[in-house]
């Protein structure tokens, strides 16, 4: 007796599963999870290298077929080729998430363009010169060896470091599924690239744009080189020791000032200035005022009745002047005839007061201490008035004592080391302020927190220092550069104003660097007078030819034995009176001329005789490149061509990478997430293994125009989303294996099939719109919504009964499989640009019979989007009728007794006054997922039937009730005449199989 219930359960279980083998259950080799080893070894080569090379070779073949028809070639390029220019990453260290963000965004764009019928040219690059790599090379030497290491040795070690970094980064990039040819990158330290760069420089020389001047430049004291504005970052919380300092007017100037003020006292007058850089006071050579302002003479009643001069509005705001008495006011122009002295220098030189438009009355005193060697505005005013430029500071940021008066030497020497003081040391500011106090020049001092430029590499504050440097004159270039941007499409739009403002505010570009690792500035200097330089169009062209023959390292072998080789023949007799310069070009000039790679591709490989209007369709980099690569690319291209045309048609920018707390990823903070940690996971940090597709999904789902966050929470959401994609594809592929492989025409499809295809068509239109807007996150959102609502919750669920239980050759099953194939084709097309290895895995699992081997192979490479032309009526008809019925069915089903848990346990009656009702009972049963539908035409509705009014005026009545029949042990629909007996449909299916 005790065993009977158990036996009954076993018998019941056996009954329910006795027919499982007769069902057409999904079968596919498509895995539940991705396999990283297979992805890297098989799927990436198939979906990246093979595709890129195949499509490019097809394009090159089409070009070759056109022979010498240059116009036809140009037309083919402009209409059919899509070019995205790679901004070269720096060849130093491992890749971080920012690299993945950048490269994957580019790849998504390229793949989408390929799917729209374009051919793709995308050549990856590496930026190899510059200070960080040189510093890595120098670290291999002991400090006492550094002064003895030759430039050639430094360059060899730097080159070796860069090559190792490129090899490492290439391997890491290879896991991102980027569609390109990694064996053919451009590298800025390769000979041909350097020659091309020098040719651009030659063009700028020929246009008179390259000049040498002793001007103030930003200077990195740690790195000991000049810096461009793009190499700076600003510390908003920098602290300086600020001081209000008095400079005495000469006796004669005091008299003139009193005369202008119409007073006749006998007293000294000082000019009150404010500075945040007391160390520059030794370089003071003028004081600037603004002739538009009014200035007050204030008497210090506590100091013998002497006077100070301050701008009128600011005089009211300076608290330490509270005991000073206003005596008179004079116009700014009254100061123009005056002179003063600088007691710090211990001389009696009378120095000028000069008008300056840069002088404001928003801070300070309205009188500006002017040191032409340490300030840009200072230099400009001094240059216009022929005031000397001095900068007694060396490359390390120490005072040059030999250029300062002897009485200052002891004060400005460190007692412990005996070295000149560092100008930025707080102790230096203290001794200077103490000296000012003793001399009676210090009126007040205070700590001042403000924004200050830092070297972006060393993270140390910079100074402004006048040194002889080479500059590109931008006065005649920036107008064309700004005009060129008017024709460029920016995404996001704000990028236009940002890039334009950077160019507009730039009059020159300091392109020389005092380093060994870089492309040389091909200038020659007189041995007996280094201020005399030789660099003409002729000499630069000759140097380029010599470098092509001897190699670029030959320039850096600084001996006199072969100077005649480096200069044109007409300089043979005087060649030995010159020596070669040691300066190298700013690395932004290196990478900024990367458009040469495209120029060579068009002219040399495609053999075009005319370049397309825009060399690249897209430039895409981080938002910081408005100051860097975007700017240098625009300036060099416009300066070279002499035309207001940028090298890019569209410019796209992305943000920085943050952790989930909104904090910028930083090694020092310890919140950096590497691409490898995203791909393989990191259990110690709670990071799930997302694989290659997960890394790409993480990038695509972000709003990349703002800063992009990554972390455990976001990554777990990505893992769930990927799981849903794989489940959807498993369903599609699993139900496309057992088939007759017959595709049914559209006219023969059911309303639910046509509705599903229309919704698929809608999805494609939506996705294409978002792709064209570079809004990849919305592409994914649209696909996920469609997958959840139109597939999983509707079509997939509706189709399962027929797919699993109908005969393999049933017409309805063929109808469904036809639609499933279209869903698969559309989904792989839509998400292919974002998840290429997932799509490749799907393609590999799809039976060839559905497409034919030739068609399958072509779609594998080009993956064009399916074309649909389905009328809107297909959607409206189904939505207005069948979906209305489904809503009412669900409402009534929810009110049934608790023992009724599945729609297959119910029967649905639909009554219509129309005769006949234009609906098929079997189709409605599938849609409602009920055991069966009974359609009744005419008759009086029962009270239990609910009225439904359709938009076309038809009135229906519906009743959902429990089925009185038994459960079929095969399909589980309650359509069997008795327990454990097959329903008629399943009985016929099995009988026909047999």
Show which residues each predicted segment covers.
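Structured ligand/cofactor/substrate-binding pocket environments in proteins
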Residues: 39, 98-111, 118, 126-127, ...
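Acidic, turn-prone loop/beta-hairpin segments
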Residues: 127, 221, 228-236, 739-765, ...
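Short cysteine-rich clusters marking metal-coordination/redox-active sites
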Residues: 220, 455, 526, 568-573, ...
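C-terminal low-complexity, glycine/proline- and small-hydrophobic-enriched intrinsically disordered tails
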Residues: 716, 845-994
């Amino acid at each position: 007796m005790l065993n009977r219930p158990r036996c009954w359960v076993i018998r019941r279980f056996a009954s329910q599963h006795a027919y499982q083998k007769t069902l057409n259950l999904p079968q596919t080799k498509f895995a539940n999870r991705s396999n990283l080893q297979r992805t890297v070894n098989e799927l990436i080569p198939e979906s990246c290298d093979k595709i890129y090379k195949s499509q490019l070779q097809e394009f090159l073949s089409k070009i070759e077929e056109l022979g010498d028809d240059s116009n036809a070639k140009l037309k083919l390029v402009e209409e059919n080729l899509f070019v995205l220019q790679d901004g070269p990453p720096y060849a130093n260290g491992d890749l971080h998430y920012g690299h993945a963000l950048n490269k994957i965004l580019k790849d998504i764009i390229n793949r989408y363009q390929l799917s729209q019928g374009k051919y793709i040219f995308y050549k990856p690059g590496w930026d190899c010169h510059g200070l960080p790599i040189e510093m890595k090379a120098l670290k291999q030497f002991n400090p006492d060896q550094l002064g003895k290491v030759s430039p050639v040795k430094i360059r060899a070690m730097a080159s070796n470091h860069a090559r190792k970094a490129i090899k490492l980064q290439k391997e890491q990039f290879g896991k991102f599924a980027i569609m390109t040819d990694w064996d053919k990158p451009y590298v800025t330290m390769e000979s041909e690239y350097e020659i091309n760069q020098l040719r651009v420089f030659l063009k700028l020389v020929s246009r008179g744009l390259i000049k040498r001047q002793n001007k103030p430049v930003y200077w990195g004291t740690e790195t000991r080189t000049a810096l461009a504005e793009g190499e700076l970052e600003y510390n908003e919380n920098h602290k300086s020791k600020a001081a209000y300092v008095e400079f005495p007017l000469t006796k004669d100037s005091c008299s003139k000032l009193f005369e202008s003020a119409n007073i006749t006292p006998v007293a000294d007058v000082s000019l009150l200035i404010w500075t945040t850089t007391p160390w520059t006071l030794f370089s003071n050579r003028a004081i600037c005022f603004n002739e538009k302002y009014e200035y007050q003479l204030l008497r210090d009643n506590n100091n013998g009745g002497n006077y100070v001069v301050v701008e009128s509005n600011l005089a009211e705001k300076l608290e330490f002047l509270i005991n000073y008495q206003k005596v008179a006011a004079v116009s700014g122009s009254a100061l123009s005839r005056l002179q003063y002295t600088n007691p710090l220098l211990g001389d009696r030189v009378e120095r000028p007061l000069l008008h300056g438009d840069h002088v404001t009355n928003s801070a300070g005193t309205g009188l500006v201490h002017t040191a032409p060697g340490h300030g840009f505005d200072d230099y400009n005013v001094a240059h216009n008035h022929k005031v000397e430029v001095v900068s007694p500071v060396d490359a390390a940021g120490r005072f040059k004592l030999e250029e300062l008066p002897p009485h200052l030497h002891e004060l400005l020497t460190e007692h412990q080391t005996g070295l000149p003081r560092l100008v930025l040391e707080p102790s230096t500011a203290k001794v200077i302020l103490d000296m000012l106090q003793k001399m009676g020049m210090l009126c007040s001092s205070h700590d001042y927190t403000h924004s200050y430029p830092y070297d972006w590499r060393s993270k140390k504050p910079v100074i402004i220092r006048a040194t002889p440097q080479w500059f590109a004159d931008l006065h005649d270039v920036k107008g064309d550069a700004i005009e060129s941007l008017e024709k460029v499409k920016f995404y996001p739009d704000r990028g236009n104003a940002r890039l334009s403002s950077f160019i507009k505010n730039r009059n020159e570009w300091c392109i020389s660097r005092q380093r060994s690792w870089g492309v040389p500035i091909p200038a020659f200097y007189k041995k007996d007078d280094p201020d005399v330089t030789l660099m003409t169009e002729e000499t630069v062209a000759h140097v380029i030819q010599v470098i092509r023959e001897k190699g670029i390292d030959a320039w850096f072998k600084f001996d006199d034995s072969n100077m005649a080789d480096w200069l044109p023949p007409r300089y043979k007799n005087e060649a030995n009176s010159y020596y070669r310069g040691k300066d190298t070009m700013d690395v932004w000039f290196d990478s900024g001329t990367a458009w040469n790679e495209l120029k060579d591709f068009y002219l040399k490989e495609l053999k075009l005789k005319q370049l397309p209007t825009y060399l690249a369709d897209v430039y895409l980099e981080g938002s910081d490149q408005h100051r860097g690569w975007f700017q240098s690319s625009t300036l060099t291209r416009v300066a070279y061509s002499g035309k207001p045309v940028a090298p890019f048609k569209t410019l796209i920018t992305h943000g920085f990478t943050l952790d989930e707390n909104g904090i910028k990823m930083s090694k020092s903070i310890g919140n950096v997430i590497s691409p490898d940690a995203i791909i393989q996971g990191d259990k110690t940090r709670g990071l799930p293994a997302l694989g290659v597709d997960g890394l790409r999904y993480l990038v695509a789902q972000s709003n990349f125009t703002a800063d992009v966050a990554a972390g455990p929470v976001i990554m777990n959401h990505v893992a769930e989303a990927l799981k849903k994609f794989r489940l959807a594809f498993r369903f599609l592929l699993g139900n496309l294996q057992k088939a007759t492989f017959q595709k049914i025409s559209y006219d023969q499809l059911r309303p639910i099939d046509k509705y599903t295809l229309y919704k698929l068509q809608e999805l494609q239109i939506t996705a294409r719109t978002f792709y064209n807007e570079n809004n990849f996150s919305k592409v994914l959102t649209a696909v996920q919504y469609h997958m959840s609502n139109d597939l999983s919750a509707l079509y997939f669920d509706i189709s399962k009964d027929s797919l699993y239980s109908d005969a393999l050759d049933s017409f309805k099953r063929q109808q469904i499989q036809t639609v499933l194939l279209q869903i698969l084709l559309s989904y792989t097309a839509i998400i292919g640009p974002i998840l290429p290895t997932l799509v490749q895995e799907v393609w590999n699992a799809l039976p060839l019979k559905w497409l034919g081997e030739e068609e399958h192979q072509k779609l594998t490479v080009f993956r064009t989007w399916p074309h649909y032309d389905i009328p809107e009526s297909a959607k409206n008809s189904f939505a207005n009728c069948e979906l209305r019925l489904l809503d009412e069915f669900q409402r009534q089903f929810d009110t049934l007794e608790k023992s009724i848990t599945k729609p297959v346990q119910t029967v649905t009656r639909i009554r219509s006054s129309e005769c006949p009702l234009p609906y098929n009972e079997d189709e409605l049963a599938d849609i409602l997922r009920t055991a069966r539908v009974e359609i009744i035409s005419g008759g009086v509705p029962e009270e239990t039937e609910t009225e439904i009014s359709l938009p076309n005026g038809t009135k229906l009545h519906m009743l959902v009730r429990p089925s009185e029949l038994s459960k079929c042990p095969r399909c589980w629909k309650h359509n069997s005449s008795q327990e454990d007996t097959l329903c008629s449909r399943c009985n016929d299916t099995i009988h026909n199989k047999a």
